[in-house]
């Protein structure tokens, strides 16, 4: 089934007909879950439609500055338009650049960095090169994404990611940062976790572990999912 070409939230609207990767639950979870307390500068890597950057803008105080990076030209232009049409056009800056190059060139450091990186390994070709690049782990590994984010991170900052469960567990073992929060995402009550929300820091401290169920056994959105996302979804 084709996804909608637009998506309306409580405080902003997303057009996505030019973007390979559409608005999805993963991005909404990350945008709502990421800890942005006391953050002044925020960065969303691989912003796509601009969804997470806009969610961070909605959640953060007016003085905060948000940057977003997107390589694909069509996605960049659409995210730029989505941002300009939002209430936070003066709060978000967007850059068309590869995240590795951006990490090398950018002189600024950020308090909070978010990323919803591509997660399917190369296999069956997608219908378009644009979607192929957006969806598959072709050009950079998840460790590359985390290393790029680390270069851009303030000393006391935090990086927040969402990944498939096994890839997330593997990344925790490979990276040189400390995992300080881990939330197992269970699509339906009684099932095994499919995703991991992860927070990384340079500072070592006890990892806060939790889990979140999206659908209960009656195929209804769980109370915890509604609570997390109620500031965004129109029907919550």
Swiss-Prot record:
Its EC number is 2.1.1.223. Its main location: cytoplasm. It is found in: Cytoplasm. Signal peptide: none annotated. Coiled coil: none annotated. CDD domains: AdoMet_MTases. The keyword Cytoplasm applies. The keyword S-adenosyl-L-methionine applies. Gene3D superfamilies: Vaccinia Virus protein VP39. Keywords: Cytoplasm, Methyltransferase, S-adenosyl-L-methionine, Transferase, tRNA processing. One of its GO terms (biological process) is tRNA processing. InterPro entries: SAM-dependent_MTases_sf, Small_mtfrase_dom, tRNA_Adenine-N(6)_MTase, tRNA_adenine-N6_MeTrfase. It catalyses: adenosine(37) in tRNA1(Val) + S-adenosyl-L-methionine = N(6)-methyladenosine(37) in tRNA1(Val) + S-adenosyl-L-homocysteine + H(+). One of its GO terms (molecular function) is tRNA (adenine-N6)-methyltransferase activity. GO terms for cellular component: cytoplasm. Disulfide bonds: none annotated. PANTHER family: TRNA1(VAL) (ADENINE(37)-N6)-METHYLTRANSFERASE. Specifically methylates the adenine in position 37 of tRNA(1)(Val) (anticodon cmo5UAC). Belongs to the methyltransferase superfamily. tRNA (adenine-N(6)-)-methyltransferase family. This is tRNA1(Val) (adenine(37)-N6)-methyltransferase.
């Amino acid at each position: 089934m084709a996804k909608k070409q637009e998506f309306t939230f409580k405080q902003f609207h997303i057009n996505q007909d030019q973007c390979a990767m559409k608005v999805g639950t993963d991005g909404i979870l990350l945008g709502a879950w990421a800890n942005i307390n006391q953050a002044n500068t925020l960065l969303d890597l691989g912003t796509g439609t601009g969804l997470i950057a806009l969610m961070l803008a909605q959640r953060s105080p007016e003085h905060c500055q948000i940057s977003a990076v997107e390589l694909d030209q069509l996605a960049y232009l659409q995210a730029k338009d989505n941002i300009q049409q939002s209430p936070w056009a003066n709060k978000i800056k967007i850059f068309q650049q590869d995240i590795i190059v951006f990490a090398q060139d950018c002189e600024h450091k950020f308090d909070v960095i978010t990323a919803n990186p591509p997660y399917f390994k190369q296999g069956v070709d997608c219908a378009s090169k644009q979607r192929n690049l957006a969806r598959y782990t072709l050009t950079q590994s998840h460790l590359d994404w985390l290393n790029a984010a680390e270069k851009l991170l303030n000393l006391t900052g935090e990086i927040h990611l969402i990944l498939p469960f096994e890839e997330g567990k593997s990344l925790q073992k490979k990276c040189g940062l400390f995992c300080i929060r881990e939330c197992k995402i269970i699509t339906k009550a009684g099932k095994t976790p499919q995703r991991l929300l992860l927070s990384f820091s340079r500072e070592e401290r006890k990892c806060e572990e939790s889990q979140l169920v999206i659908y209960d056994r009656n195929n209804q959105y769980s109370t915890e999912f509604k609570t997390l996302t109620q500031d965004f979804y129109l029907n919550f």
